C-alpha cells in the first residue's frame, strides 16, 4: 500500500500558502488566451514582465489601473495560484494568468472555475513539480530512458516504420492520439496518419475507434454542439442527462444557467453539488437512475407526453421527417455507411405516426415498469414529464433544452443518445433559441482532420458486411500492431479492461527479448527489426509528462511536447467559439509542439518531397488546415481568406478578436466576418453566402438529406443491448455493485497538471470512491479506508468478428463463437461514505493513472456504434486498510460533496 501512495504522489501534508503576489508594472505585456481545460474555455489575460521589476500599489503604478488594497471582491485582484515565474527569451519573467474581466462572452466579468484559477501553476518552473516535465527526446536502453537528439529519435522511428510498412503494411502502423489539443497539432497528426501513411489503425484518446460519441444525435440530424451558451440561459427547463454542468462545465452553469428561475432535471446516480444547489433552491429534481437505463426513462417520459397530447405537434409537423423523407436522397446505392443503414432499418426508423403508435406499445415505457427498471419513483418520472412538456396555463409551451454527456452515452451508447434525441424532438427542441438538444462537452473542440483515412480497411464488418470502424484496442490485443505512436493520452487507463490491455502491451514491448542495448542507430534498427519480426511491438510516446505506464514502462522512444502557453495555438469551445491561445513563455528544454514533431518525422520518412511538412511556425499549419474544415461546423476558412486580403497572418487576425473570438462556422457578410450562434436554426437561412463559402443545409435545418430531423425508435429489448446488459449486471450472489466513474470540479482528466499543482494535489492526493452507507456499513467500510474494487469476470471481445447475419455481433453469439474472453481487474481507492450516491452504485475517479477504474469495465463495444460502455463496471468492495487521510485534516477532505 505504501508503494501505491508513493506512486500516486500521495501522503498527508499541509501546503504552505504564498502570502503575496507581485503586481504587474504599467508596461507589463498583456496577451489573451483561454483556459486549457473544460469545454467552456473561459477567456484569460496573461500579464508578463521581467523578474526584478514590480508594479506599485497606486493605480498609476500598476497595469490593473487600480489602487491597492481595495475592497472590491470582483475587482482587479490576483491570487498566488494565478502567479508563476517562467522563461521568456531566456530570461526569468513573472506571469499572472487572470480571467478576463472585460470579455463579453463565455465568462463575462471574469467568472471562472477553480481549474482555470490555477492555470498559471501549470507553466513550467524548475522549482516545483512541473520540473517533472519531459525535456529531451529519449530512447530506452536496457530499460532506462536516455536523452538523445531529435535527429536520432526521429531517424530511429523512421527506420523501423519504413521496414514495417514495407513488410507488414499500413495496418501494422498505428496512432493513438488526442482529438482536441489544438487545430495545428491535430491537423498535422491526421495528415501523417490518415494521408501520408494511410493507416486504418487510428483511434482517438477516448475511444478504441475513430468514431463519434453521441451517434444517436448524429442519426437524428442533430449536431452534438449545435447550441450556444445563450440557449442554456434562455431555456426554462434544462434536462441534464448524465451530467452536472457545475462539476464539469462550471462557468456555463454559474454564469448562464443559475440566474433566473429555470428548473433543472438531473439524471445521474450521483447527487453532485449542482444537484444539491438546484434542490435547495426549489428549482431542481434529482433522478438517481440505475446506470444504463436512461433509454427506459426516455421511453416513459415520451409515453406520458403522447398519452396526454403534450407533444409540440406544430414543430413535429414542420421539422420531423415522414417515412418518405427519411429515405430521400439515398439513390439506389447500398446503405453501407452507419447512419444510412441505421436510420433506414425498420428496427430504428420511424416517423411521427409510427413512433406515436409504437411508444404506446412498449411495456418498458409503462410508468410502473419503467420505475422498476430505472430505480426511480413513478411520481418523479411523471413530474419530470410535466416539467419538460406540459403546456402552461395560457397554452404556451415550455422552453426545454436537453443536455447529455458521458453518464448518458457511455453506458448505453446508441440507444441512450437516440432516445434522448427523440424525447427532445417531440418536445419541440433542437433548432431554436432556448430549445436545443446538445452535448455539454468534455474537452474543447480542437480537432481538424486532414481528410483521407483508411478506416474502411477494417477487417471487421457490421451485419450485412457493412463498413465498420477499426478497433485499435482489439488490434493491439490480437498482436497485430508492430509500431504505435501514442500522443498525449493515457491509452491503457482510459480504455476498458485496462489491466488486460496493460499486460498485453507489456508482453509485446518490454516483455519481448529484443531490447535496445546501445544508442547506435544501426544496432537499434536491427534490434527493433528482430522484435517486430518475432511478433513484438515498438512504441513511441509524445507527451508533456512521463505517462504511466505507456511512457514510463513500455515506450522505446519518448518525445517531449510543448503545450499551452508555449506556442500559438487555436481551437473552439463547446459553443464553437474560436480563439487564439497565445504563446507567452519558452517551452522547457528541447520540448517541441506536436506539429513540429510530426513534421520532423515526416521529413525523415521522405514525405516532404512534394513540398509538404515545410511549416515554419504554427500559423503555417493553421492556414493550411483551414481549407479542410470548410464542410464542417468548425469552419474558419473565411478568417484565413480575410487575413490574406489584409496581408496579415491568420493567427494575427484572430488575435485581434481577443477572448471574445468568433463562433464557427464563420461566413462573410458585407465583407466582414460573421459568426454563427447556433446550428440548425431557420434564422440562419441567410441570403447568398459571400466569398468562397457554400451554404450548408445544416446551418438552417437539421443535418439530414431532407433537412428534417429523424425520429428514432429505441426498443429496450434490442438483443445487441439486452444480452450484454444481462451479462454485465452486478451479481448479487457475489455481493457486487455497479462501478461507474466521473469527474470532480477541482481536477481535470487524468490529473496530468493537477497532481503537480500544490493546492489541488493536497485536495486530491489519491483517487476516491464515493459510496452510499448501505454499501459501506455491511462491509465494515468507513470514510478514509482503502477499498479494493475487484471484478473476477471482465469480458473482452476478441478477434475480428464478421457481421453477416443480424445477430453475429450480439453478445450471446460472440460468446458462442469464441469472440468473448474473460479476465479480472481491480483498483484501490479511498472511500468517501455519503448519501450523495444512490445505493447499489459507487463512483470512482475518472482516469486516475494509479487506480484505473476502467479495469473493472468490459471491453465489449456497442454493436451499433463500436463504442464501449465506459461507465458500466461492476465489482466487489473490500476494505484493505486505513489510508493516511482517515485521521488527518491536512489533505484530502472526506466530507460529502453535496453540501450547499
From Swiss-Prot:
One of its GO terms (biological process) is respiratory electron transport chain. Pfam families: Molybdopterin, Molydop_binding, Rieske_3. The record marks 113 as: Involved in charge transfer. Keywords: 3Fe-4S, Iron, Iron-sulfur, Metal-binding, Molybdenum, Oxidoreductase, Periplasm. Binds 1 [3Fe-4S] cluster per subunit. Binds 1 molybdenum-bis(molybdopterin guanine dinucleotide) (Mo-bis-MGD) cofactor per subunit. Gene3D superfamilies: 2.40.40.20, 3.30.200.200, 3.40.50.740, Dimethylsulfoxide Reductase, domain 2 (3.40.228.10). GO terms for molecular function: 3 iron, 4 sulfur cluster binding; metal ion binding; molybdopterin cofactor binding; NADH dehydrogenase activity. Its EC number is 1.-.-.-. The keyword Oxidoreductase applies. One of its GO terms (cellular component) is periplasmic space. Its cofactor is [3Fe-4S] cluster; Mo-bis(molybdopterin guanine dinucleotide). It comes from the Bacteria. Disruption phenotype: Deletion mutant is incapable of growth via iodate respiration, while growth under oxic conditions remains unimpaired. Residues 1-21 are annotated as: Disordered. The keyword Metal-binding applies. The iodate reductase (Idr) complex is composed of a molybdopterin-dependent iodate reductase (IdrA and IdrB subunits) and two associated peroxidases (IdrP1 and IdrP2). Involved in iodate respiration. May accept electrons from cytochrome c551, and catalyze the reduction of iodate (IO(3)(-)) to produce the chemically unstable intermediate hypoiodous acid (HIO). This intermediate then undergoes abiotic disproportionation to yield two molecules of iodide (I(-)) and one molecule of iodate. The resultant iodate subsequently cycles back into the reductive pathway. The initial reduction of iodate may inadvertently produce low levels of incidental toxic H(2)O(2), which is detoxified by IdrP1 and IdrP2. NCBIfam families: arsenite_ox_L. Belongs to the prokaryotic molybdopterin-containing oxidoreductase family. This is Iodate reductase subunit IdrA.
Amino acid at each position: 500500500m505504501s508503494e501505491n501512495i508513493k506512486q500516486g504522489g500521495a501522503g498527508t501534508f499541509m501546503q504552505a500558502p504564498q502570502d503575496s503576489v507581485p503586481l504587474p508594472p504599467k508596461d507589463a505585456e498583456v496577451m489573451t488566451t483561454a483556459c486549457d481545460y473544460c469545454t467552456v474555455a473561459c477567456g484569460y489575460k496573461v500579464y508578463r514582465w521581467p523578474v526584478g521589476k514590480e508594479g506599485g500599489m497606486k493605480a498609476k503604478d500598476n497595469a490593473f489601473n487600480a489602487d491597492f488594497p481595495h475592497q472590491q471582491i470582483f475587482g482587479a485582484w490576483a491570487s498566488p495560484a494565478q502567479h508563476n515565474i517562467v522563461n521568456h527569451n531566456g530570461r526569468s519573467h513573472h506571469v499572472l494568468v487572470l480571467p478576463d474581466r472585460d470579455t463579453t462572452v463565455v465568462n463575462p466579468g471574469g467568472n471562472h472555475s477553480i481549474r482555470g484559477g490555477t492555470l498559471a501553476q501549470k507553466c513550467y518552473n524548475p522549482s516545483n513539480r512541473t520540473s517533472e516535465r519531459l525535456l529531451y527526446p529519449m530512447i530506452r536502453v536496457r530499460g532506462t530512458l536516455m536523452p538523445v537528439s531529435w535527429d536520432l529519435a526521429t531517424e530511429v522511428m523512421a527506420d523501423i516504420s519504413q521496414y514495417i510498412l514495407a513488410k507488414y503494411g499500413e495496418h501494422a502502423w498505428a496512432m493513438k492520439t488526442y482529438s482536441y489539443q489544438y487545430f495545428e497539432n491535430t491537423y498535422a497528426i491526421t495528415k501523417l496518419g490518415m494521408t501520408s501513411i494511410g493507416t486504418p489503425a487510428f483511434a482517438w484518446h477516448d475511444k478504441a475507434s475513430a468514431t463519434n460519441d453521441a451517434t444517436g444525435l448524429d442519426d437524428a440530424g442533430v449536431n452534438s454542439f449545435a447550441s450556444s451558451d445563450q440557449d442554456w440561459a434562455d431555456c426554462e427547463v434544462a434536462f441534464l442527462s448524465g451530467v452536472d454542468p457545475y462539476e464539469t462545465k462550471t462557468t456555463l452553469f454559474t454564469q448562464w444557467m443559475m440566474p433566473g428561475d429555470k428548473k433543472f432535471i438531473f439524471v445521474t446516480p450521483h447527487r453532485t453539488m449542482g444537484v444539491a444547489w438546484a434542490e435547495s433552491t426549489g428549482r431542481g429534481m434529482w433522478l438517481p437512475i440505475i446506470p444504463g437505463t436512461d433509454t427506459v426513462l426516455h421511453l416513459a417520459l415520451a409515453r406520458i407526453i403522447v398519452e396526454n397530447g403534450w407533444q409540440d405537434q406544430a414543430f413535429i409537423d414542420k421539422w420531423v421527417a415522414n417515412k418518405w423523407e427519411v429515405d430521400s436522397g439515398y439513390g439506389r446505392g447500398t446503405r453501407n455507411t452507419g447512419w444510412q443503414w441505421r436510420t433506414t432499418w425498420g428496427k430504428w426508423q420511424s416517423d411521427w405516426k409510427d413512433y406515436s403508435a409504437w411508444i404506446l406499445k412498449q411495456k418498458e415505457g409503462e410508468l410502473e415498469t419503467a420505475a422498476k427498471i430505472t430505480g426511480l419513483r413513478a411520481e418523479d418520472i411523471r413530474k419530470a414529464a410535466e416539467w419538460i412538456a406540459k403546456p402552461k396555463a395560457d397554452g404556451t409551451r415550455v422552453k426545454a433544452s436537453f443536455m447529455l454527456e458521458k453518464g448518458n452515452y457511455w453506458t448505453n451508447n446508441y440507444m441512450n443518445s437516440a432516445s434522448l434525441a427523440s424525447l427532445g424532438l417531440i418536445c419541440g427542441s433542437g433548432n431554436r433559441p432556448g430549445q436545443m438538444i446538445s452535448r455539454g462537452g468534455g474537452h474543447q473542440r480542437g480537432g481538424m482532420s486532414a481528410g483521407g483515412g483508411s478506416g474502411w480497411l477494417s477487417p471487421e464488418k457490421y451485419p450485412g458486411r457493412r463498413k465498420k470502424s477499426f478497433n485499435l484496442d482489439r488490434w493491439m490485443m490480437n498482436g497485430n500492431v508492430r509500431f504505435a505512436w501514442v500522443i498525449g493520452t493515457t491509452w491503457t487507463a482510459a480504455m476498458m479492461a485496462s489491466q488486460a490491455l496493460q499486460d498485453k502491451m507489456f508482453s509485446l514491448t518490454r516483455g519481448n527479448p529484443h531490447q535496445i542495448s546501445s544508442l547506435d542507430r544501426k544496432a537499434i534498427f536491427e534490434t527493433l527489426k528482430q522484435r517486430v519480426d518475432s511478433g513484438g511491438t515498438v512504441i513511441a510516446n509524445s507527451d508533456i509528462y512521463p505517462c504511466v505506464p505507456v511512457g514510463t514502462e513500455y515506450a522505446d522512444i519518448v518525445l517531449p511536447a510543448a503545450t499551452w502557453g508555449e506556442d500559438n495555438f487555436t481551437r473552439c469551445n463547446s459553443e464553437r467559439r474560436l480563439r487564439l491561445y497565445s504563446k507567452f513563455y519558452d517551452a522547457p528544454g528541447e520540448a517541441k509542439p506536436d506539429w513540429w514533431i510530426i513534421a520532423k518525422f515526416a521529413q525523415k520518412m521522405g514525405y516532404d518531397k512534394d513540398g509538404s511538412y515545410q511549416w515554419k511556425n504554427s500559423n503555417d499549419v493553421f492556414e493550411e488546415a483551414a481549407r479542410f474544415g470548410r464542410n464542417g461546423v468548425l469552419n474558419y476558412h473565411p478568417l484565413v481568406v480575410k487575413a490574406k486580403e489584409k496581408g496579415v497572418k491568420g493567427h494575427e487576425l484572430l488575435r485581434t478578436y481577443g477572448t471574445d473570438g468568433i463562433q464557427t462556422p464563420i461566413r462573410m457578410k458585407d465583407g466582414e466576418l460573421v459568426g454563427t450562434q447556433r446550428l440548425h436554426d431557420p434564422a440562419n437561412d441567410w441570403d447568398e453566402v459571400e466569398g468562397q463559402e457554400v451554404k450548408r443545409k445544416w446551418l438552417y435545418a437539421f443535418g439530414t438529406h431532407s433537412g428534417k430531423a429523424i425520429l428514432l425508435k429505441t426498443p429496450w429489448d434490442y438483443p445487441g443491448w439486452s444480452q450484454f446488459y444481462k451479462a454485465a449486471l452486478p451479481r448479487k450472489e457475489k455481493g457486487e455493485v455497479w462501478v461507474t466513474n466521473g469527474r470532480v470540479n477541482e481536477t481535470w482528466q487524468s490529473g496530468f497538471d493537477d497532481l503537480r499543482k500544490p493546492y489541488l494535489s493536497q485536495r486530491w492526493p489519491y483517487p476516491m470512491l464515493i459510496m452510499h452507507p448501505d454499501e459501506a456499513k455491511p462491509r465494515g467500510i468507513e470514510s478514509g479506508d482503502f477499498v479494493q474494487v475487484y471484478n473476477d469476470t471482465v469480458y473482452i471481445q476478441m478477434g475480428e468478428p464478421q457481421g453477416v447475419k443480424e445477430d453475429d455481433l450480439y453478445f450471446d453469439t460472440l460468446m458462442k463463437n469464441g469472440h468473448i474472453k474473460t479476465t479480472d481487474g481491480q483498483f484501490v481507492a479511498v472511500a468517501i461514505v455519503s448519501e450523495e450516491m444512490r445505493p447499489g452504485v459507487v463512483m470512482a475517479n475518472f482516469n486516475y493513472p494509479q487506480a484505473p477504474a476502467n479495469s473493472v469495465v468490459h471491453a465489449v463495444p456497442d454493436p451499433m456504434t463500436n463504442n464501449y460502455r465506459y461507465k458500466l463496471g461492476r465489482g466487489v468492495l473490500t476494505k484493505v486498510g486505513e489510508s493516511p487521510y482517515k485521521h488527518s485534516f491536512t489533505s484530502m477532505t472526506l466530507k460529502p460533496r453535496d453540501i450547499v
